[in-house]
Design a protein with these regions (language model features):
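Hydrophobic face of amphipathic alpha-helices that form TPR/SEL1-like repeat modules
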Residues: 2-9, 36-43, 47, 70-79, ...
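Short helix-capping/linker turns of helical repeat alpha-solenoids
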Residues: 13, 27-30, 43-45, 63-67, ...
């Protein structure tokens, strides 16, 4: 019995078999299995939801520095859920440990916390570093937020072209905020040639993707009779 067999059962949707195998492996001290079993308890897969078991398993695995246990535990502390009190400082430390172990969403969370000074000293240059690390691994929100830093010159030298590239990548991935921000660049001619038609098209895409400000703009343009749809 190996973690690979347990993972295969889980990925095939055989949660009962996966739960049984993860339990055996977790009891034997396998940190990957502890993490997966904690996730199953958290989501009630082949078992009743159990916050205490989830916390116990994530904590054990995090002590062994299992990357996703660190990240999942950080989310609990960040939001004050799962039987723990809200603790931004603990959340930051756990996210940072996960980020250092190549977990892209943890890299993004570390960057976001550094940018806002949540659970740590505000540091725009460190935020830019971690946004870039997450973006390199395809994290769309990281591309978008890095683009904002390049646009405003926070933590990095202001760079119109890099800003445009970052927003473009976020938009290519279908991120509503990416569409909206890229549309603003085309509207302003920031990092690209001004193109109001492209700006409007991107604003529409953002609206269709659920962006509230874009919806408002499109609605106002329709009401004014400037566009049909």
């Amino acid at each position: 019995m190996t973690i690979e067999i347990a993972n295969a059962a889980y990925n095939a949707g055989d949660f009962e078999k996966a739960f049984e195998l993860f339990t055996q492996l977790a009891n034997a001290g396998n940190a990957d299995a502890q993490t997966s079993l904690g996730y199953m308890y958290q989501n009630g897969q082949a078992c009743e939801k159990n916050e205490a078991k989830t916390l116990e398993l994530y904590t054990k695995a995090a002590e062994a520095m299992q990357p996703y246990a660190l990240f999942n535990l950080a989310i609990l502390y960040e939001n004050g859920i799962g039987g723990v009190k809200h603790d931004q400082f603990k959340a930051f430390d756990l996210h940072l440990a996960a980020a250092e172990r190549e977990v892209p969403p943890a890299m993004y969370e570390v960057a976001l916390m550094l940018e806002r000074g949540l659970g740590c000293m505000q540091n725009f240059s460190e935020a830019a570093f971690w946004y870039e690390e997450a973006a390199k691994r395809g994290h769309l929100e990281a591309f978008n937020n890095l683009g904002v830093l390049y646009k405003e010159g926070h933590g990095v030298v202001q760079d119109e072209r890099r800003c445009f590239i970052c927003f473009s990548r976020a938009a290519e991935g279908g991120l509503a905020q990416g569409y909206y921000n890229l549309g603003l660049l085309y509207d302003q001619g920031f990092g690209c040639e001004q193109d109001h038609d492209k700006a409007l098209d991107l604003c529409r895409k953002a609206a269709y993707a659920g962006h509230e400000k874009a919806k408002q703009i499109i609605s106002e343009l329709q009401a004014e009779g400037k566009i049909v749809f």
